[in-house]
């Protein structure tokens, strides 16, 4: 009986770990157009809220994506290429995130912003190298 209980506990732990460590699988991203033309977006995030955006970039032109929040909550930023592979992340503590990516090919990139630890107003910026 103890082995069954341990097995069930282990399965539940794995399911919870996957749910926490694999962000935004169910979030439908909003297309914001071309990354070079994007200025910034102010986002109201609830506790444990998340949003996803799509931006298009040109191969070889590095971009930097950042977040900054008004309150000291824990904001995470994840970037995925068009195949769904994670190409960058900043899951450090605090409201500020920063990632740099140099696209290998032209295409859309998905940005997932997740907030933990209380509601926050977050500014999302993207700068493309000239």
Which residues does each PLM region occupy?
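Bacterial N-terminal signal peptides that target proteins for export
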Residues: 1-12
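N-terminal signal peptide c-region/cleavage motif recognized by signal peptidases
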Residues: 17-19
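Predominantly extracellular/luminal regions of secreted and cell-surface proteins
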Residues: 22-36
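Acidic, Ser/Thr/Pro-rich low-complexity intrinsically disordered segments
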Residues: 25, 43-121, 128-130
